[in-house]
């Protein structure tokens, strides 16, 4: 029975990670990002696709390509995108995400 719960918890974590990645892509495509220039911000964030495997619980450490993509993003661009993404649950009439460190 414990293995079923563990599997369910792992599946939930994987689903949440995948959902967050999808939400980030949606934000990139549908929201105006307050970055100058916008095209540069969008292109940089699109480059984060190489980080997708790292978002799944139990995955290995981030690849060199992922780290390089994150390093190349403008600070304001990343912060504005995270701020916009955090608003999505409320805009969809969902409760805010509450994530633990575990």
From Swiss-Prot:
Signal peptide start-end = 1-30
| Disulfide-bond pairs as recorded | 41-77, 51-66, 67-92, 79-99
Q: According to the lineage, what is the superkingdom?
A: Eukaryota
Quote a single Gene Ontology cellular component term: extracellular region
The subcellular location is: Secreted
Q: Which PANTHER family match?
A: PROTEIN 108 (PTHR35501:SF8), PROTEIN YY1 (PTHR35501)
Q: Which residue ranges does UniProt annotate as crossing the membrane? A: none
Concerning its family, UniProt says:
Belongs to the A9/FIL1 family.
- The name this protein carries in UniProt is Protein 108
Q: What tissues express this gene product?
A: Stamen- and tapetum-specific.
| Main subcellular location of this protein, as a coarse class | secreted
Source taxonomy: Eukaryota, Viridiplantae, Streptophyta, Embryophyta, Tracheophyta
Q: Which UniProt keywords apply?
A: Disulfide bond, Secreted, Signal
């Amino acid at each position: 029975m414990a293995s079923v719960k563990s599997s369910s918890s792992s599946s939930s974590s994987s689903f949440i990670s995948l959902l967050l990645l999808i939400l980030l892509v949606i934000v990139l495509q549908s929201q105006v990002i307050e970055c100058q220039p916008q095209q540069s911000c969008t292109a940089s964030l699109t480059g984060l696709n190489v980080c997708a495997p790292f978002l799944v619980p139990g995955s290995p450490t981030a690849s060199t390509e992922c780290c390089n993509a994150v390093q190349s993003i403008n600070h304001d661009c990343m912060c504005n995108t995270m701020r916009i993404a955090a608003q999505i649950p409320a805009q969809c009439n969902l409760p805010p995400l509450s994530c633990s460190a575990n």
